[in-house]
């Protein structure tokens, strides 16, 4: 299933073929930055280890 099929009508107005769905590890200023959800998941996993 392609990424374009999941777009609603409003999103199609500003969706271009050079855009990509966001990766979990994107590079910002040469440094790998974890997404917010991954940071939360990791901290939760550390907090609830037993």
Curated annotation (Swiss-Prot):
Ranges of Polar residues composition bias in the record: 26-41
Any Pfam family matching the protein: YpzG
InterPro entries named among the record's database cross-references: YpzG-like (IPR025413)
Region of interest (Disordered), ranges: 21-50
Domain of life of the source: Bacteria
Name this polypeptide is given: Uncharacterized protein YpzG
